[in-house]
Amino acid sequence: MSTIDALYNRPGPNRLRQADAYRTTNRQDAVKIRMAKDGIGAEEPISVPGLLKRTVNNYGDYPALRTKNGKNGYHTVTYKQYEQKVHQVAKAFIKLGLEEHHSVGVLAFNCAEWFYSAMGAIHARGIIAGIYTTNSADAVQHVLESSHAQIVVVDDAKQMDKIHAIRDKLPKLKAAIQIQEPYSPYLKKEDGYYRWSEIESMNVSDVEDQYMTRLENVAINECCCLVYTSGTVGMPKGVMLSHDNITFDVRGIVKAMDRVVVGAESIVSYLPLSHVAAQTVDIYTCAFVAGCIWFADKDALKGTLVKSLQDARPTRFMGVPRVYEKFQERMVAVASSSGSLKKMLASWAKGITLKHYMVSQGKSSGGFRYKIAKSLIMSKVKQALGFDRVLTLASAAAPMSPETKKYFLSLDLKIVDAFGMSETAGCHTICLPDSVGLNTIGKTLPGCESKFINKDANGHGELCIRGRHVFMGYIDNKEKTEESLDDDCWLHSGDLGFVDDKGYVSLTGRSKEIIITAGGENIPPVHIENTIKKELDAISNAFLVGEQRKYLTVLITLKTEVDKDSGEPLDELSHESSVWVKSLGVEHKTVSDILAAGPCPKVWKSIEDAIKRANKQSISNAQKVQKFTILPHDFSIPTGELGPTLKVKRNVVSKMYADEIEKLYA
């Protein structure tokens, strides 16, 4: 009997259920696992509870979670304590009515309770379903309803208000639990509302046997996690991920990372855990390597992230491109306010460091000047950012411009692109440690497959993906599942690109984002937008328009200050924009000032010239921008143009600024 065959005859959680197909839309079904003949794809599968148990057995006294406790201190939970919390929460969920294959929704910022809820739901043979805190009540209802949620855990009274508003529309929902004070009035007045402290102190001895039976029935090839797509077209789809989808992807990520030291890794958790990349890295990968999670506070993306990084000094960091751009803007502002000698030294050091990477492609050249720059200047820069111990800086969720990568290379900080989807449990390709990778998303993870179909004359086509990390199907949505996942288990990503002779994958756009002009030309918007932004640092967003139009136009937003409380863009120009405006010989301090001046002719011409420079880099006349306009404020999450991971919602922007767009074609 093979090792895999033996998994069908053992108790859970590390067991397999018999299955007839590789895909399903039923949350109660199991799926077949596509085992490879050798390599990582042939390794024995493991469940999420099995992964945690193995780490607890070997590293039980190591720190697992650190939460801010007061102004400067942190409360630490070890892996043994973490597991004990998970068991308590799992039993409490069962006592509150959680049935097998039903979900627990979590509507909260990153915190230890998020982790306990996710692991607790999975250990109880339920399903974890994350919900973005920025979701409206209607969007929350969609997730809870479609995921068959029986319990929801929320962050605070604001989120509980959303639940209360839709509670009557959710007959399956049995309990709503609030983590933080001040507590909503419903917790005292109405049944079915609980404080988190009640979950931790609940007497669960009467469900002990039931819990152990549940845990023994957990199977590696059944659904344990639902991740919801962005919903840019229609309602978000629920991506069903099995234990093996997640734990196999985790193995691939760890194998691809540089110098992993089990028991010594640390990560700052700040990207929304509802996003597949954050959940896979923070909850599951960190547990796999017995790493320590440091929780950033709610305002991390509003300016407090650096403080958390300084406290944690992480060994790995994952960000979206906009986070790195914010770091860059801050560093540029600080540098411009320095004295002339400091500026000169910093400029020299950055030039030497960038040259080292561009010449050596990231391999240590041992150059004397590089060593001096690294030890005297770059070490201080890294320390100021909290990156003095970091081994991997990864960028995910959207393409990063080569210019931003070069800026960080000049600081001796190498950012590697990682690519994945909700449907691939988070990661499919990653740049290897020995590659600078300015224009690539890296190589396919070990044990996974990539191919490009429907190629054009240049060898560019649609990326298709196969491997044990590819999802089970969309919950209760057979049509969309069969559209995305073919009979040979290839996932059709919708991403366009190519692979070079060394195996490095590059993406050029998404098929759904491609603009088709009235003349039938296919235009990749992101490349053109990034080219325009590269030509003028004061531009925050360039949004290309031209679907079924005779020519291309672009909506421009300028970099401005941000309200630290709400996260909304202010009218006041950022330092970078102010320096640019002054260089033009005008004294405008706000976007309103610029627009009220006509718009300001000098500002207008500067943007126009930047677009002309970008147009010179176009491969055809059809890809040249003919007109533009300046929008009254920058894009943001609160104003609706950006999603939770700071990606532009293209359909939303097109609707919000429909009048401005029509004027460009009048």
From Swiss-Prot:
Keywords: ATP-binding, Fatty acid metabolism, Ligase, Lipid metabolism, Nucleotide-binding. ATP binds at residues 229-237, 417-422, 495, 510, 624. CDD domains: ACSBG_like. Disruption phenotype: Adult neurodegeneration, with marked dilation of photoreceptor axons. Results in degeneration of lamina and retina, defects in the fenestrated basement membrane and ommatidial disarray. The phenotype is exacerbated in constant light conditions and improves in total darkness. Effects are probably due to elevated levels of very long chain fatty acids (VLCFAs). Feeding the fly mutant with glyceryl trioleate oil or medium-chain fatty acids, blocks the accumulation of excess VLCFAs as well as development of the pathology. The keyword Acetylation does not apply. GO terms for cellular component: cytoplasm. Pfam families: AMP-binding, AMP-binding_C_3. It is an enzyme of class 6 (ligase). Signal peptide: none annotated. Its EC number is 6.2.1.3. GO terms for molecular function: ATP binding; long-chain fatty acid-CoA ligase activity. GO terms for biological process: fatty acid metabolic process; long-chain fatty acid biosynthetic process; long-chain fatty acid metabolic process; neuron cellular homeostasis; positive regulation of circadian sleep/wake cycle, sleep; response to endoplasmic reticulum stress. The keyword Ligase applies. InterPro entries: AMP-dep_synth/lig_dom, ANL_N_sf. It catalyses: a long-chain fatty acid + ATP + CoA = a long-chain fatty acyl-CoA + AMP + diphosphate. Belongs to the ATP-dependent AMP-binding enzyme family. Bubblegum subfamily. Mediates activation of long-chain fatty acids for both synthesis of cellular lipids, and degradation via beta-oxidation. Probably by regulating lipid storage and catabolism, plays a role in neuronal function. PANTHER family: AMP-DEPENDENT SYNTHETASE_LIGASE DOMAIN-CONTAINING PROTEIN, LONG-CHAIN-FATTY-ACID--COA LIGASE. This is Very long-chain-fatty-acid--CoA ligase bubblegum. It comes from Drosophila melanogaster (Fruit fly). The gene is bgm.
